[in-house]
C-alpha cells in the first residue's frame, strides 16, 4: 500500500540520465550522500504525479549518485524520470539521539527570541560548511517583514519544542 503523500520525506532528486543503459543521475539530500542508496523502494513525486520505483544498484560518482532502477533499461525512458523527487516514508528514517533533529522536523517551527518576540518561521536550512543556517521568513504575528539567516548552533538555539512548534533562540532582532 502506498504511503500517504504527507508522510513522505524528500531524500533526493533525479536530475538527468547517466550513461546509455537507463541509469539516472541523482542529487542526494542525505549525509553522507550515498545513504540514499540504503533505501531500495522509492516513491517518486513530480508535479502532483506519484510513482513507485525500486533501486537495483547505485554508486557514488563525484558529488552525485548514479542509480539503476528496476525495469529502466533505456536512456530515453530514463530521461522521462528527470525532475522527480525521491521520497521515502518518514518511518523509514533512522532514530536520532536526544537533541538531534532532521531538517524536516525544524522546518515550519516558529522562531522566538529571548524577548519573546516572534521572528518568523523556519522556511528551510542551508548547509554552509562551517554550520547549518536556518532561513527564517516572516509570518502572521512576526516582529517585522524581514527574512533572517540564523546559525543552527548551540550558541544560537536555546531550545526546541516540536510539540509546541517552537524554537527559542538567542538572537538580536536587529540582525
From Swiss-Prot:
Pfam families: PRC_RimM, RimM
Chief subcellular location: cytoplasm
Domain PRC barrel: 98-175
Record keywords: Chaperone, Cytoplasm, Ribosome biogenesis, rRNA processing
Lineage top rank: taxon: Bacteria
GO biological process per UniProt: maturation of SSU-rRNA
GO CC annotation terms, alphabetical: cytosol; ribosome
GO molecular function, one term: ribosome binding
Listed Gene3D superfamilies: PRC-barrel domain, RimM
Protein localization: Cytoplasm
Similarity section: Belongs to the RimM family.
Role according to the record: An accessory protein needed during the final step in the assembly of 30S ribosomal subunit, possibly for assembly of the head region. Essential for efficient processing of 16S rRNA. May be needed both before and after RbfA during the maturation of 16S rRNA. It has affinity for free ribosomal 30S subunits but not for 70S ribosomes.
NCBIfam families, per the entry: 16S_RimM
Subunit (UniProt): Binds ribosomal protein uS19.
Domain topic, free-text comment: The PRC barrel domain binds ribosomal protein uS19.
Xref: PANTHER family: RIBOSOME MATURATION FACTOR RIMM (PTHR33692:SF1)
Official protein name in the record: Ribosome maturation factor RimM
Species of provenance: Pseudomonas aeruginosa (strain ATCC 15692 / DSM 22644 / CIP 104116 / JCM 14847 / LMG 12228 / 1C / PRS 101 / PAO1)
Annotated gene: rimM
